[in-house]
Amino acid sequence: VKHEKKDQWTKLAKGGINGPIPTLFYDYDVEDIRRDITCVPFKWTSDNDGDIAWKAPNKCWGGWSFGKVRFEWMNRVVDSSNDDGMNWQVMRMADIYLMAAEAINELEGPKGSSDAGKYLKAILDRSYPAEKASAILTKAKASQDAFFNVIVDERKFEFAGEAIRKVDLIRWNLLGSKMNEAKEKMTRLYNREGEYADLPLKIYYNEGLDGTDATSYKMYGLNHGDTDEIGQTLGYSKSKEWIVPKESADQAAALLLIDQLYDNNPDTKQFWPIWKVFIDGSNGVLTNDYDY
């Protein structure tokens, strides 16, 4: 989760720069326990470095935080100014289960003797209420393609923010199509059209969002079916236009973020080019190929 200044949990000047695009929050089922851990709509801020921080709603566009790794959940204060000391996870058991399910489906389909579904089921049972987990598994077992599509979604939901989604999409040859899909979804969200038409214009919250409470927040207006009419009656002290920012400069910034989700064809420019400083220092050994 983003920290704007040094505070009661960290002496780093900032943290939590990267975050999900806002449509990811709405891709999750509302009862998926991973949603509110992964997609966090607030940041920690304060008036001055070293002050006690409080929660503030972050920008819808370019402001969400990934919430799986949080200074405020650690049992020590990060007292270094340049290193948080966290050990980054390389592989989780969920990755092994979903890889097994994917591999078996490719070899045997969803109804083969090795039972790809049992590995998928373990992830679904942990994430959803029993009835929804069963329904998703039944949908997946309808065909090999259906099972693959569920795997694509579940790996998104399970590993968002863990730096493996891009390589998954590359190996499936889906990077370009999913990036296009993201632009289209974000445009519909900005216009509150299609699957986002029932979202309210504003979010409603209290000043400070429960202050230093590190484990929860109260905010109305994020979910499908929330309305501005109800939000105005709930007694929150603050509200703000969020999906479509009120200020024209913020509107322009949001549209620019959508447009710049990618500049080059993702399927032909999948990786960073080699930086010029490394090429210059390689004694002619390194070059950028493939039209970089």
Regions found by a protein language model. Name each.
Residues W44, P129-A133, F157-G161:
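Intrinsically disordered or highly flexible coil/loop and linker segments, enriched in small
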Residues I37, N48-G50, S134-A135, E162-I164:
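Short, solvent-exposed loop/turn and secondary-structure capping segments
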Residues A116-Y119, S143, F147:
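Stable alpha-helical elements in mature extracytoplasmic
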Residues G85-A130:
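Extended amphipathic alpha-helical segments enriched in small hydrophobics
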Residues Q144-K183:
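Acidic/serine-rich, low-complexity amphipathic helices located in mid- to C-terminal regulatory regions
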Residues K132-K141:
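Cytochrome P450 fold signature focused on the C-terminal beta-domain
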Residues V1-M99, E106, W172-Y292:
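Elongated scaffold/linker segments in the mid-to-C-terminal portions of large proteins
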Residues D36, G117-L120, V152:
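Hydrophobic face of alpha-helices
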